[in-house]
Amino acid sequence: IMMAMKLEKENALEKAINLENQLKEKAKDFEKKEEEMNDWLSKVKNIQTEVDTVQESLQEAISKLEETEKRATNAEAEVAAMTRRIRLLEEDFEQSSGRLTETSTKLDDASKAAEESERNRKTLETRSISDDERMAQLEEQVKEAKYIAEDAERKYDEAARRLAVTEVDLERAESRLETSESKIVELEEELRIVGNNMKSLEVSEQESLQREESYEETIRDLTERLKTAEQRAAEAERQVSKLQNEVDRLEDELLSEKERYRAISGELDTTFAELTSF
């Protein structure tokens, strides 16, 4: 019996030693796991910080893109306004041309009447008051023609003023388009930096991977919107160039019509002087 008890005691002691060794191993494993957990939590915290930084960069890029789109829209609106002004200017120009043609016709009629009056003047000197009325009528026609010509000149001056205003508006639109292009270049650089930062992130958890995919999708969307804004800005610039050509053409036509008016005005003054000498 003593031998059995001694053997049992030795077995119990051996088990106690084994359990103590196992407990120490478990404690070491626990410490190792705890250390790994702390490292993992530190990595997650760093990743979260990088994600927050990317979010701020994305928000700033979105704000700048919205500002660029707004400026492009404003530029397009200015181009549309200038188009309407050019159209109104063309209408005024056409009306002035029509009045000038009418003035030329009346001047021709007055000149013909003056020539006829000159041919008949010597034979009509002894006639009654009807001859004086005829002369007064001719003078009234000449005065009316001169008034119409002066009105046409005022219309030309107004057209020239509107052309000057349109040129100023075109210069402002071009300046704003240049500013928009500069902002677009800056935004492209910022988007490129954001894209590089996104690629350098090391996301070990599924949630971080999902966030990265979401940010990449947002960047693609921003890039697409940026391309659209660039296209709109380019289109607005083409419209400005087209309008500038139209303004140049109208200025040339206006100059030609003014020269024509000066010639007609000279003829009108000569005719009026001849009629006055009667």
Curated annotation (Swiss-Prot):
User: Biased composition, Polar residues: where in the chain?
Assistant: 95-104
- Which residues span the membrane? none
* Coiled-coil boundaries: 1-270
Ranges of compositional bias, category Basic and acidic residues: 105-134
Keywords associated with the record: Coiled coil, Repeat
Where in this protein does the record put region Disordered?
A: 92-134
Name the InterPro entries on file: Tropomyosin
Q: Which Gene3D superfamilies match?
A: 1.20.5.170, 1.20.5.340
Q: What does this protein do?
A: Tropomyosin, in association with the troponin complex, plays a central role in the calcium dependent regulation of muscle contraction.
What family does this chain come from, according to its entry?
Belongs to the tropomyosin family.
The cross-references to PANTHER family, in alphabetical order and at most eight, read: TROPOMYOSIN (PTHR19269)
Per UniProt, subunit arrangement is:
Homodimer.
**Domain annotation text?**
The molecule is in a coiled coil structure that is formed by 2 polypeptide chains. The sequence exhibits a prominent seven-residues periodicity.
Protein name, UniProt field: Tropomyosin A
